[in-house]
Swiss-Prot record:
GO cellular component, one term: chloroplast
Coiled-coil region list: none
Protein's recorded name: Large ribosomal subunit protein bL20c
Record-linked PANTHER family: 39S RIBOSOMAL PROTEIN L20
HAMAP family (alphabetical): Ribosomal_bL20 (MF_00382)
Keyword Chloroplast among UniProt keywords: yes
Cellular localisation: Plastid, Chloroplast
Species whose genome carries this gene: Piper cenocladum (Ant piper)
Family: Belongs to the bacterial ribosomal protein bL20 family.
Amino acid sequence: MTRVRRGYIARRRRTKIRLFASTFRGAHSRLTRTITQQKMRALVSAHRDRGRKKRDFRRLWITRINAVIRGSGVSYSYSRLIHDLYKRQLLLNRKILAQIAISNRNCFYMISNQIIKSGECEEFNGII
């Protein structure tokens, strides 16, 4: 029986996997079985962390806004600020508010003071 030469399909598949894992350390970038295992693990982690990244950034923005609000000296909290923003129908999301709070505090203080003033006027109008 004559010798049969194998095709290139399996080799092409393995080189594709090796290119994916070329930055991994140790046997994870050299041995085919461990490469496939690490590739699956990396893709699972990437899928999980795409959702986690959104949550982490939202937490960071909320923390930054709250820190600047509480540092202003006025007894005002993040939750009251967001509540008043929604009441006034101001379309500023948490990402933009956090960027304003970090880069331009005076502008952020002006926004929050304007909201506080308009909130106090409405409360007095409701009492009288």
